[in-house]
Amino acid sequence: MEHQKTTPHATGSTRQNGAPAVSDRQSLTVGSEGPIVLHDTHLLETHQHFNRMNIPERRPHAKGSGAFGEFEVTEDVSKYTKALVFQPGTKTETLLRFSTVAGELGSPDTWRDVRGFALRFYTEEGNYDLVGNNTPIFFLRDPMKFTHFIRSQKRLPDSGLRDATMQWDFWTNNPESAHQVTYLMGPRGLPRTWREMNGYGSHTYLWVNAQGEKHWVKYHFISQQGVHNLSNDEATKIAGENADFHRQDLFESIAKGDHPKWDLYIQAIPYEEGKTYRFNPFDLTKTISQKDYPRIKVGTLTLNRNPENHFAQIESAAFSPSNTVPGIGLSPDRMLLGRAFAYHDAQLYRVGAHVNQLPVNRPKNAVHNYAFEGQMWYDHTGDRSTYVPNSNGDSWSDETGPVDDGWEADGTLTREAQALRADDDDFGQAGTLVREVFSDQERDDFVETVAGALKGVRQDVQARAFEYWKNVDATIGQRIEDEVKRHEGDGIPGVEAGGEARM
């Protein structure tokens, strides 16, 4: 998405109204020793703009950066979706923003944390946003808990400090978090660079083909650079030397022509099979076995262009899972449905009602709707009708009947957990990750990392954490408890001053 550059002014600067500015170095005063005057308009405008030049940082995912690129479809997946962006041979401009979840602007890139992987496709049918992470799962499956979760990873209201007790209190009171916390405390919680990590859509989405056939789909972006991670000591050292390590690595790699690539694969579950699969496919804390549904290659994502203006093209980029296109829909995943509202609403607050008019957020195709005016709205509506139906020749949409990207649902309005499937539980997949995926060395490092993160945690929460990990794996849980008790009072890796886990 091209950014409009400001033309250099050969004869000096101007005021905001375009008139010449007399000086950018000297204020207007009454004599050389006198006070400045209120009608020094250029001085006042300069400070007024400076006071308003920032927009609120994202509540989660505040620290990040990104780049533009291209997605090329190399395989034929038209049997799964009619979306033009995924038709054979299609090339689509993209924007990918990486981030950490918990850290604020200015926090180190190499803190242990989940990494955001927010991808926009500028398609012929509109912007398609896939707002994912570098993990295939998440801590929660109900959006009612989301705001509480984010607060538990932020700062205490009195001291303004982050607090390991608060983090573990939330996790252990919500056992569905176990799979993601295991992933986080494992080797992939500290990616060496953004280029050397995978990305995932995490949620389950609905794909619909030209014949109306439906599949539930999971996205996997597999790094062609391989997956490489940092040790606790390496991450701590880099955090103290260069808080922007990941941002710098990405920018400099692209600048010298080393363009990172990811291959996109999907898992496709036939619509009806989603109703009876042994895990609930709409539970964000679970993965879908690749033995049951192997990955299918779609194409390759390449990042090849750095932003020209970080604020205008990265900080002002407004992603939302609600931005879908024909052939791609949402699913009964509660977290996905909650995010579809919350993310767009957050962008309206953070950037403004005109958010979709900014160049980085504008779709490539023409927009025709009945949204008019509002704060900072600058589209000219002229004599267009502002209402429908109308008799003035302005078109509108009026389709009725079932929607392509819908699903069946019935029942009484209720507040309760999702129905359990045959193999559903909160600790099983986390245990499999520890026992069958981690190497012996990775298990040893995992025990050390978790024990370090539990250092200084209040004893009742610590005791609950020991049981939490024993539910994941009895042996690992006991090793964690033994390690914490053995090192009580000592400094151990993985803990910042004050007992804060490196998150």
Swiss-Prot record:
This is Catalase. One of its GO terms (cellular component) is cytoplasm. Heme binds at Y343. Pfam families: Catalase, Catalase-rel. Its cofactor is heme; NADPH. Residues 1-27 are annotated as: Disordered. Its EC number is 1.11.1.6. Signal peptide: none annotated. GO terms for molecular function: catalase activity; heme binding; metal ion binding. The active site is at H61, N133. It comes from Micrococcus luteus. Keywords: Cytoplasm, Heme, Hydrogen peroxide, Iron, Metal-binding, NADP, Oxidoreductase, Peroxidase. Homotetramer. It comes from the Bacteria.
